[in-house]
A protein has these predicted regions:
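Aromatic-enriched hydrophobic runs in primary sequence
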Residues: 8-9, 28, 138
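Conserved beta-strand elements of the Class I
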Residues: 18-20, 64
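Short, polar loop motifs at secondary-structure junctions
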Residues: 23-27
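Short alpha-helix boundary/capping motifs
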Residues: 20-21, 70
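A short, flexible N-terminal coil/short beta segment enriched in small residues
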Residues: 2-18
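TOPRIM fold recognition
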Residues: 13, 32-37, 44-138
């Protein structure tokens, strides 16, 4: 017999792809609102093991790169997109993901996160600088 938590999980929005985030607070925030799996990069010095984990996830279910709307987040996104082609990318505006002192997806509300996940883009064979140009437009 299902418990109350099981019923709640069925009502939560299920994300098929595995979401790549920077850290555990991002994971906690996403799992608060969505039924999803994440891979945490642990910061901007992404090691080969994490890249391989992302490659494996991309081949199984696909991945969505969802990093913070700041310089380190953009650097992480760039590294992942260079090493793992055809990733989907979710973006939030930094004004919708901040506190007084910090910027990060862990500070965004459910609607902001959901809108970002519904409007993912895939960057393919992008010339250098095009991701930065795109980020300046959003």
């Amino acid at each position: 017999m299902p418990t109350g938590l099981d019923s709640w999980r069925k009502l939560m929005d299920r994300i098929h792809e595995i979401i790549v985030v920077e850290g555990r607070h991002d994971t906690q925030r996403l799992k608060k609102y969505f039924d999803c799996e994440t891979i945490e990069t642990g910061g901007s010095s992404i090691d080969d093991k994490v890249i391989e984990q992302i490659r494996h996830a991309a081949s199984r279910r696909g991945v969505i790169v969802f990093t913070d709307p700041d310089t380190p987040g953009n650097q992480i996104r760039h590294i992942i997109n260079q090493h793992v082609p055809n990733c989907k990318n979710a973006f939030v505006d930094k004004h919708n993901a901040r506190t007084e002192k910090k910027v990060g997806i862990e500070h965004a509300d459910k609607d902001t996160l959901w809108n970002a996940l519904q409007n993912v883009v895939t960057i393919t064979n992008a010339p250098k600088g095009s991701l930065v140009t795109y980020l300046n437009l959003v």
